[in-house]
């Protein structure tokens, strides 16, 4: 008899689980706001973000020149600067005020200032200086200015050394100017591009943030549609905590299994980004990450009482989370307090693990720390979800019982 009852309980629980899954799926499909966060944003936002950085690096950044020397050496230096792909000299100004005006008006993004003593110092064998001013509103402009001028100064230094060395052969010139030969090889990001560096981290963050927004919006809708503003409806199918948590999470898992495949596999391929991950490794790593994000979002949704609240609470966190993940800003430079805060979010370990798997060809063994922590987060947030949903079931029952008591009193 006991086994029979247990069998009935399991059977009824399974039926309720799939009933809740189906109801949640219908709620997602019928809610345009949730569809936007679950479908439209994951489909469109990666494309938009990648299109913005599709050129990887900036080329031919316009620059102004103030040449107070006007010698053959200063003109040669400027030719070397202009010959590269990074910078384009668009204006020769008579003084700094004219150059500053161009910079303020946005016609140039940098100024190259050559002092009057430029050629005289070189002739005397005294170190001379070239000053560059850059619009620091864009770090890529600064990078282009610095790279172009550094390369030009190094090349000019070589020419000056050759002229003064008195060597008799080309080989002697090579040895005197470059005694140690080196080769600069960019690994994992051969283009030295911004998209290859930033987009993988953004794709992982989109999964977490859209889940937070979508699940939060769905929770706000459920409360607004409930007579007592409860998250859990009073229904015989919604009596068990596990069936509710697993039923809802199964809906989100099915949706994001498809969305994650699109974002992490198709989008990088469409834009020829670095992608050397093994399919099995990537799938094994993403499974706990998506689960951790789902249960994290379900736990946080308990604080959402209105549909619009999730927009005000979660949207602004995207940029800070990207910074404290240790990708766009060095992890060693992050204050310890914010580093500890970042451990609460699945995106921190998801981003670091995915970048190493996707861009560096790492295996699960190489990202074992991140992989284990994601499973720990999955377990912890699953427990917190069960706790808060159990609390909601209790509140829902209490509100219904209180309402029944009021009705009985009125009838008396």
Predicted regions, residues:
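Hydrophobic alpha-helical transmembrane segments of multi-pass membrane transport proteins
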Residues: 44-47, 185-267
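Alpha-helical membrane-protein architecture signal
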Residues: 14, 18-22, 196, 237-250, ...
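Loop-to-transmembrane-helix entry motif
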Residues: 28-35, 206, 247-253, 257, ...
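Extracytoplasmic/periplasmic domains immediately adjacent to an N-terminal transmembrane anchor
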Residues: 1-196, 366, 391, 397-412
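Membrane-spanning alpha-helical segments of multipass transporters and channels
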Residues: 48-49, 70, 91, 101, ...
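Hydrophobic alpha-helical transmembrane segments of integral membrane proteins
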Residues: 38-39, 196-197, 316-317, 342
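Peri-membrane helix termini and adjoining interfacial loops of integral membrane proteins
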Residues: 170-181, 227, 344-357
């Amino acid at each position: 008899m006991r086994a029979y009852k247990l069998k009935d309980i399991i059977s009824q629980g399974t039926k309720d689980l799939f009933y809740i899954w189906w109801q949640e799926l219908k709620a997602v499909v019928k809610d345009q706001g949730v569809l936007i966060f679950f479908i439209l944003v994951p489909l469109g936002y990666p494309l938009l973000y990648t299109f913005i950085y599709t050129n990887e690096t900036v080329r031919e950044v316009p620059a102004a020149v103030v040449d107070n020397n006007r010698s053959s050496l200063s003109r040669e230096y400027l030719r070397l600067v202009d010959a590269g792909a990074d910078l384009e000299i668009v204006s020769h100004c008579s003084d700094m005020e004219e150059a500053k005006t161009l910079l303020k008006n946005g016609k140039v993004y940098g100024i190259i200032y050559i002092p009057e003593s430029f050629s005289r110092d070189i002739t005397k064998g005294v170190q001379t200086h070239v000053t560059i001013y850059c619009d620091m509103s864009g770090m890529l402009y600064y990078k282009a200015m610095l790279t172009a001028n550094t390369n030009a100064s190094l090349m000019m230094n070589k020419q000056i050394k050759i002229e003064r060395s008195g060597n008799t052969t080309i080989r002697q010139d090579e040895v005197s100017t470059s005694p140690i030969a080196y080769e600069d090889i960019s690994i994992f990001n051969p283009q030295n591009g911004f998209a290859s560096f930033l987009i993988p981290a953004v794709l992982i963050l989109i999964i977490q943030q859209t889940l937070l927004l979508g699940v939060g919006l769905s929770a706000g809708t459920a409360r607004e549609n409930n007579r007592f503003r409860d998250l859990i409806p009073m229904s015989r199918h919604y009596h068990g905590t596990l069936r509710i948590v697993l039923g809802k999470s199964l809906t989100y898992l099915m949706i994001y299994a498809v969305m994650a495949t699109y974002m992490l596999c198709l989008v990088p391929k469409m834009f020829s980004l670095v992608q050397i991950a093994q399919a099995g490794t990537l799938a094994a790593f993403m499974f706990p990450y998506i689960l951790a994000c789902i249960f994290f979002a379900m736990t946080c949704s308990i604080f959402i009482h209105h549909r619009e609240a999730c927009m005000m609470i979660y949207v602004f966190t995207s940029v800070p989370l990207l910074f404290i993940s240790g990708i766009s800003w060095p992890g060693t430079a992050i204050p310890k307090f914010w580093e500890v805060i970042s451990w609460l979010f699945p995106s921190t370990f998801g981003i670091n693990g995915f970048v190493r798997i996707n861009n560096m060809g790492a295996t699960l063994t190489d990202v074992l720390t991140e992989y284990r922590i994601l499973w720990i987060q999955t377990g912890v947030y699953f427990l917190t979800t069960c706790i808060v949903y159990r609390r909601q079931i209790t509140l829902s029952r209490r509100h219904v019982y209180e309402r029944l008591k009021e009705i009985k009193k009125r009838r008396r």
